[in-house]
From Swiss-Prot:
Keywords (A to Z) from UniProt: Isomerase, tRNA processing
Superkingdom to which the source organism belongs: Bacteria
Record protein name field: tRNA pseudouridine synthase B
Active site positions: D49
Similarity field: Belongs to the pseudouridine synthase TruB family. Type 1 subfamily.
One GO process term, biological-process aspect: mRNA pseudouridine synthesis
The gene coding this protein: truB
Pfam family, one: TruB_C_2
GO molecular function term, any single one: tRNA pseudouridine(55) synthase activity
UniProt-listed InterPro entries: PsdUridine_synth_cat_dom_sf (IPR020103), PsdUridine_synth_N (IPR002501), tRNA_psdUridine_synth_TruB (IPR014780), tRNA_sdUridine_synth_fam1_C (IPR015240), TruB_C (IPR032819)
Amino acid sequence: MARRGKKKGRPISGWVIFDKPKGMGSTEAVSKIKWLFSAEKAGHAGTLDPLASGMLPIALGEATKTVPYVMDGTKVYRFTVTWGEERSTDDLEGQPTKTSDKRPSREEVEALLPDYTGVISQVPPQFSAIKIDGERAYDLAREGETVEIPAREVEIDRLEIVGFPDADRTEFEVECSKGTYVRSLARDMGRDLGCYGHISDLRRVEVAPFTDEDMVTLAKLEAVWPPLPPKDEDGNVIEPAPRRDFSALDALVIDTGAALDCLPQVPLSDDQAQRVRLGNPVILRGRDAPLEADEACVTTRGKLLAIGYIEHGQFKPKRVFTAG
């Protein structure tokens, strides 16, 4: 049997709530963070377009197992709609497809907001990652095809005006469910107002359970990044190489368990924790221990240990973590 290759990088686990700059793709951002932390494994919880800035939660190591819980979280965006043009991509990148000389008043925009609050039907943009017959919509759109993308329901918890800098632009903040396309909001509001519109600025400020206070910029990460060992003219590390100190960088990592605030959390004793590590169920003790739960997580010494479910007061693990 062939030996499995040794994993490259450090076995660090947790969340880096990255303040992605404009112009950087989500995959590029993950690669950058993985490299900075010299991590074995990394992934993100929800794509953010290159033209957008703001929160991109990036999971390191064992935290990648909790990505689905963050992806399901409520999102908050701040965005600017420029009126008078509808574009092929519904943002600044596209070509104008429809134009209008009309500009909406603040009163007209405010009167429209209730129609975009609650559960609404929305057609994703032509340039989106939606799959049509196995192909991404944006790939088909780049080839000049106009594809029929079915409408789907999304939930808008809150949509409000936060600025009206001039007649051409309105600034909004929206709190919405997974799967909401802010570009579609701009397009549809423009059509309803009879003036057309597209996104000219987009920033994500929250992905539940994380808030804007959790975000770290690339500059902050690079300021505490431990430099690589010096190399000679041939590219070989000069020995003895000093040990790299990642402590300041690692201090910016949020515990893996923070992603599971939506689940009941039950602390275990050391003996119970050992049983769960081996994949065995345990009877939960204590007056406040839940008797039933479709999903729950357990902790040991303040660190996440496992996700599972509770049945008749017994926790049954489905996913065990090796690091908190």
